Structure formats: structure tokens, C-alpha cells
Amino acid sequence: MKILNVKFYLALAIALIVLQCEDNDSEQNASSNCGIETTYIKDVDNIDSLGNASGSTILMVDDCSYVGVGHRAGVPWITKFNELGEQVWDKKFDEIPIPQGNYGTGLIYATGVDKTNDGGFVIVCATTMNHPSYNASGRIMKVDSSGTTEWIREFPTNRPYHGRDVIQTSEGDYIVVGSWYTTSAVTNEKSAFMARYDVDGNLIWIERYGGECDEDEFQAVIQKPDGGFIAVGKFEHESSDYNCDFYGYTDLWFVSTDSEGQVLEETKTGESYWESAYDIIDLGDGTYGLAGRRRHQRQKPSNAWYIRMDQSGNVLSEWHEPDYVNSSGKNDALYDLILLPDGETAVALGYKDDGNGDSQYLWAFNARTSEEIWNASYNEPGRGFALGISNAHDGGMIFFGKKETGRLKIFKTDENGMVMLY
């Protein structure tokens, strides 16, 4: 009888192992079957029934799909869609109150998202309102793989925080960066912040960074191989030559920290006027690509700007647009950056004023020499913008944008930025 029991349990164990292997194979096959070669520009689903949306960023997911975040009807919003741009599910965070105050209605919107180890997503948010009458601030939120809310945490202060980026760390917890509202233009409150949260949304630590002015902010963060972090953004000039209260001139700001958020190195790159960074990627060789903008002369327009930096924030190579000779190009910029699967090509998403309104634009660069390879425009009559580029499952790119109708669209291109419309 004992022998029969042993044989039974042994057979059961083998069966469970086989089933587990089949499940793993199914997951791997599902992932390996991704990559439908397609391009399109299409409306986000359910605009007519649920109202228009605004998108901030898109993230590629392992199950042949994507998630995007932004806001809809004044509150944060997340959506999941397949390779063809067809909606899988859609979630609006109605449990978060729409900000109301002395100057009308504001909104709270999702600005960043990252995958979590349990198959869900962590989301960071900002608010449009700083006035105390709104009592509004950004959030960090966790949802499961179906978009169901697991927890929501408001940033810890009675003043507005604006979360700009979030990542899951190699340790499994979360890092958020952004800026917070200071009480005056000239201040010692340090307006940029980095915060670390555990998997349950409990604050582990928060650090503030900056100088004497109120426009210091972080826009993006990545984790270094040693467990520390690099945050990038802008640092406002501070000296007797500059007036925090009026000019707001800034440098591109690169800050390297340890795992506890303590500054190890920082650099400020720029000339006399406006420079800033909006995104950073790891190039895989100990250097980093940054997307931003520069305006080195007050009478000249701002130029889109790609920079390659070493781990200390020193410029190794760079590209920027030439100055325009007319009034066009006043606010050209690169906002988001990805590295293509070849490991050699960086593609930046931004906008370019072509004289007829801002247009959605992609620029491709040799990631290391910073030489421009190609560029592509997706403009139509009227004003447009684009945000949130991601690698696509077929090797192309995917991002959010708005066109002449103001309706939010998903743009899907091939690896050369081309869209074939049939």
C-alpha cells in the first residue's frame, strides 16, 4: 500500500511538472509569435462614447500588446490594446476626485508607467493646479494585469507634487521623480524630488534636489547597474546675473545618485538661456542618450537636441537643429527616446514648428556619434503633437498623437518611421 502511494504521488508530481513546462512553453510561444508587421494611424477606441483622451506615454508588454496612460475626463486613464491598435481594456480612475478650486476645474493625469514583476503596472501622476484652493497633488498607483486598482497613494505633503516618471527597480520596489510646488520663485526649498516606495505603496524615503530657484525639476529616471539612479531635467540659473523671479533660464541637468538617493555627481550643461532634458536611455556601453532642447541665444528659437553623455554627465557627442532664419521653430524639442533592437540607432519623438503649426516628428540618430540618420513628419493641416514613443513588437515604433480634429490617435510606424495607409 505504501509503495502504491509513493508511485501515485510520484506520477502526480511528474504530471504537474509537465503541465508547468507546457504553460511556460505557451507563454514563450505567445511572446515569440508577437510581431505582426503593420503600420497605421487610428483613433483611440471609444472616443465617441467615453469622450476624448490625452495620452502621455505607451509601454510595450510581453503578451503582444501595449498599455498607454494619460487622462480622460479630468482623471488618470490607462488603456491596453493589441498589435493592431484594438482595445483590450480601458480604465478611468474615477475614485480620484477632479480638482476644483478658485480658478475653475483642473485635472490629474498619468505621466509615466512601468511594468511590475507580478504582471501589473505602476503609474505616476501629476496635477495641473498649484493653487492651495485645489488641495490637489500627484499620485503613485498600482494596478493588476487587468487594470484593476490595487492601491493609490497621494504624494506626502500639503503642497502639489508633480510626478513625471516612475520605474520598478531591480529590487522590485519603485522610484518616482518630478517636481513640487515651492512657495516663491527665489527659495531654498529645492523643487525637484526623487522618492522610493515599496511594493505596497509605502514611502521608504524622499529626497529633494536643486538650488535657490523654483524651476528645478526632474523629467526622467533610470537605474544604473550599481543600483543607483540617474535623473535628468532642468536646473534654473542662480546668480546675481539672473533673476529667478523673471527670466527662468535653465541648464540641462544630469544627477547621479546612490541607491538611497544621495548625490554622487551632477552636471549642468548649457549656455546663457534655456536648455533642458526630457528623457534618458541606457545605451548599453556605460553611456547614455538624452533627449531635450536648447536655446543658446535669446533672439533665436529653441532647437531639438540629442546628447550622448558618460556616466558622470560629460557630453561625448551631440546633435541639434540649425537656427531658423524666420519665426518658425520657436519650440522645437525632443521629448521621448528609445533604442532600436540593433543597439545602434536612437529614435527620438518630438515636435517641430514648420510654420503651419507644430507637427509630430521622429528623428533617428547614430546613438554614439549623434549623427542624424533620418527624420519623418506626420503633420496634417492644423496643430498636432505627439508623446510617449515605445519600441513595437515588430521592430517599429508606436506613440500617441493628436491631429487636426483633436482626437487622440495611435501612430504605428515601421523601423524607418514610415506609415503606409491603405
Task: Give, region by region, the residue ranges found by the protein language model.
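Bacterial N-terminal signal peptides that target proteins for export
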Residues: M1-L10
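C-terminal motif of bacterial Sec signal peptides marking the signal peptidase cleavage site
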Residues: I17-Q20
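A sequence-level/structural motif corresponding to short, flexible coil/turn segments enriched
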Residues: E22-Y422
